[in-house]
Amino acid sequence: MKINLFFVFLFELLHFVAAYSCEGDESAAIEAMNVLQVPYEKYNTDPVCAFDNSTVVELSDKTWDHVIESGKWFVQLTAEGCANCTLGELLFNDLSHAFHEKYPDVHFARVYLSSSLELSVRLLISRIPSYYFIDNQNFYRVSPQVLPKNKAIALYEKDGFKSMKKEQGFFSVNGPLKSFYWVFGKALALYGHLSQKYTPLGMNVAIFGISAYIMYRSSKKAKQKQAAAAAAAAAKKK
């Protein structure tokens, strides 16, 4: 319990100091780094920029598809209340400023999975924090070890993160099961929302029915597209 309260305190401090911009009070930012026990000199991190998240867009289940549909995005998937996540946020903020100056076409985004259950399923998140570099819907998993800005910039200049693991194959984020992940993520998010209002039995029945309906509609649309494509192909032959 004491450990949990301690991390809550650290995150409250983190968001309080985040009011500083990159031109803010460096001594206050350094003091906060020391309280959080972050070796900013080891990571060559600018303490002030590390607490400034103005160049990072916060996304959620509702905004993800509308934003990450084109362009280059470096995305952090994290949660509140863990030590590794705190360090990851600081390094990610600092990195976003470095990229903003050198490569303004690369956008940075953050997702808090505790309030975005759908994305935790759709993006196959098994550990936090996790990172994706998305280049026009091509997903690359980025290792947290690459996060310090010197390493990240050097790697991006070398091959644009293309040496990172690309998500491809049957079970991947962009694979044939993409629609299933979407449906299951929707169901899980809805389940979490309804769990605050209704009994478990009622929720299970409702979620099952809704999931079955969504899958039926998705299957029906897919068949309609296939039929239309077949008809178009037949018309061309004539």
UniProtKB/Swiss-Prot annotation:
UniProt topological domain (Cytoplasmic) ranges: 217-238
InterPro entries the UniProt entry points to: Thioredoxin-like_sf
Region forming the signal peptide: 1-19
Keywords: Endoplasmic reticulum, Membrane, Signal, Transmembrane, Transmembrane helix
Any single GO CC term annotated in Swiss-Prot or TrEMBL for this entry: endoplasmic reticulum
Gene Ontology molecular function, alphabetical: disulfide oxidoreductase activity
Membrane topology according to the record: Single-pass membrane protein
Keyword Transmembrane recorded: yes
Record keyword Signal present: yes
Membrane-spanning parts: 198-216
Subcellular location: Endoplasmic reticulum membrane
GO annotation terms (biological process): protein folding in endoplasmic reticulum; response to endoplasmic reticulum stress
Topological domains annotated Lumenal: 20-197
Name of this chain's protein: Uncharacterized protein C777.12c
Species assigned in the record: Schizosaccharomyces pombe (strain 972 / ATCC 24843) (Fission yeast)
